[in-house]
Amino acid sequence: EVFESGARLPRKVDAVIESVGASTWSHSVKSVRPGGTIAICGATTGDQPGAELTRIFFQDIRVQGNTMGSREDFARLLKFVEHADLHPVIDSAYAIDDARLAFSKIVNGDVFGKIMLHI
């Protein structure tokens, strides 16, 4: 199922992949079930959200930092993305000559989704 960003979920989930950071942290903590896991792989909106430590330890939530994996991990991830028919949200696309405009949009926080640069 797909839910609107920030929408209340019908039930708590086993795991959350948190790649946004401060602006979505609270929603991620409230969305995961007791004993669930939050996997953090990015913090584009800031890396110092309110920690919500009380909720995390009372709910026995596991917080796991994640970076890059092996080539084999990446190959498995690509197969999963293809099989699950996942597509990123594209905010906008720019020619490489307009890269300054694209980065300006990111710096100003005027982005919902990915910014593409055509090379």
Task: Describe the residue ranges of each PLM region.
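Rossmann-fold dehydrogenase core element
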Residues: 34-39, 50-92
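Short, well-ordered alpha-helical microsegments
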Residues: 25-26, 49, 74, 100
